[in-house]
Regions:
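Helix-loop-helix hairpin linking two adjacent transmembrane segments in secondary transporters
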Residues: 127-129, 158-159, 163-212
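Helix-to-loop junctions at the C-terminal end of transmembrane segments
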Residues: 90-102, 288-300, 384-385
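Cytoplasmic helix-loop-helix junction between adjacent transmembrane helices
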Residues: 133-171
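Conserved MFS/SLC helix-loop-helix module at the cytosolic interface between two early adjacent transmembrane helices
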Residues: 89-125
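A late C-terminal transmembrane helix in Major Facilitator Superfamily
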Residues: 353-389, 395-396
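C-terminal transmembrane helical hairpin of 12-TM major facilitator-type secondary transporters
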Residues: 302-346
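Paired small-residue
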Residues: 117, 128-136, 326-334
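Helix-breaking motifs and short loop linkers at transmembrane-helix boundaries and internal kinks
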Residues: 70, 102, 123-129, 321-323
Length: 421
């Protein structure tokens, strides 16, 4: 009898525990649904689109901007360099400077600064004011991207974070497709200042959407200082990898920043043809972004090494066939296909290399990429102004080959480490 009662009690206890587990699971599911702010994710994606378009708009408008501001094309290209420099500083120190400020307020402030930057650039009476406007967009780039992963983690459940980040990146991919050709077309129709003014309503819409859809994101404690980021370099795979990604993006933007002057002066195409070629680059880049994930699964480091090798070959081929429009268009289509896909691969490298510290690794990646963009556009501008396009393209190709070697060494260091920490 006692044994039977014990069995009954045990059965009741198991049933109670099962019910509690079901209730807990239901509460967790309900909590996850409550924490999913997809409207905020899409609002930030619109902000990404406007941000990328703002950052690289000068590439498609370099010639008319240089003429209007009475500077060389190389000097006009320094607008990309200064935005990269300010993005580096911001990405490293924004967490400490923002302190416990609600991250929603911080994101809204950055979006407002993006709109202000567009207005300052569009109305810039001289080169100095233009550069000040470019510095503002650099602050926004560094602040926004360094917080993107952490913000995604607060907007959606943990298992949905990769999807949220992929949606963010779709704004990036869309901007690469339409921003350059649209900027070139708008520049021909309403002038380069009008093209920058067109970014204002997009930034304002992104601000309003974020204001309505983002939840409050308070910070209860002061984030770790920027100094902790640099301790990541103690690992050989990090040092080599960051050098590889840095030289890669430096080589890319040494060449690509000055593609419009090359098309006009060497290939001898008009503004409408420039717009078409930039559209080809963007569309190819969108395709590359959608395909790169599958390719990376087949061979991660071999893919990262193949990208700069192919880009270096394209750079050399552009020198050889620069006067033939059809070949140049095909070569730049290949450039867009592989170069736009490269950031996806390198962002996949971050959680692979920093599984326990992805946010710090992401901040370091933003700083390295933006610093490289700044250096690349600066070096490219100096070479373009003083030695012509051949030296610019040769320098870009050389950097891409060096990046390939560094990526190979990174893969060896990663393999010898055996695991990621």
């Amino acid at each position: 009898m006692a044994q039977r009662e014990g069995i009954v009690l045990s059965t009741e206890k198991k049933g109670l525990m099962r019910n509690q587990k079901i209730e807990t699971r239901n509460k967790n599911e309900a909590s996850e649904k409550q924490r999913a702010h997809w409207g905020g994710v899409f609002a930030m994606t619109l902000c990404v689109f406007a941000l990328i378009a703002s950052e690289f708009m000068p590439v498609s408008l370099l010639t008319p901007m240089a003429h209007s501001l009475n500077v060389t094309e190389g000097m006009a290209g320094q607008g990309i360099a200064i935005s990269g420099a300010f993005a580096v500083m911001t990405s490293l120190f924004i967490s400490r400077l923002a302190g416990t400020l609600d991250r929603k307020i911080l994101l809204l402030g950055l979006t407002s600064m993006m709109a202000l930057s567009g207005a300052v650039i569009a109305m810039a009476p001289n080169y100095l004011i233009y550069m000040a406007g470019r510095a503002l967009i650099g602050i926004v780039v560094g602040g926004f991207w360094s917080m993107s992963a952490a913000t995604a983690m607060r907007l959606v459940p943990v298992h949905r974070v990769p999807l949220a980040l992929a949606i963010f990146n779709s704004g990036n991919a869309l901007a690469t497709v339409v921003a350059a050709p649209l900027g070139s077309w708008l520049g021909a129709v309403i002038g380069w200042r009008g093209a920058f003014f067109c970014l204002l309503p997009v930034a304002i819409l992104a601000f309003i959407w974020q204001l309505l859809s983002l939840p409050s994101m308070p910070v209860t404690r002061q984030p770790a200082g920027a100094g902790n980021v640099f301790t990541l370099f103690r690992r050989r795979v990090v040092t080599l990898g960051m050098l590889g990604v840095g030289i890669f993006f430096m080589g890319q933007f040494t060449l690509f920043t000055y593609i419009r002057p090359f098309l006009e002066a060497v290939t001898k195409v008009d503004a409408s043809a420039v717009t078409l070629i930039l559209l080809v680059i963007g569309m190819a880049g969108f395709i590359g972004t959608t395909l790169i994930g599958r390719v990376l699964k087949r061979g991660f480091y071999p893919t990262l090494m193949a990208i700069p090798v192919l880009m270096a070959i394209v750079a050399l081929a552009l020198i050889a066939f620069g006067s033939q429009a059809a070949i140049v268009t095909a070569l730049l289509g290949l450039w867009g296909l592989i170069s736009t896909a490269a950031p996806v691969g390198w962002w996949a490298w971050v959680p692979r290399t920093f599984p326990q510290n992805a946010e710090a690794g992401g901040g370091l990646m933003v700083a390295m990429v933006q610093l490289s963009i700044a250096l690349g556009s600066t070096v490219g501008g100096m070479l373009f102004d003083h030695h012509g396009y051949r030296s610019t393209f040769l320098a870009g190709a050389a950097m891409l080959i060096i990046a390939t070697v560094l990526i190979f060494l990174t893969s060896r260091a990663d393999a010898s480490a055996g695991d990621h920490s």
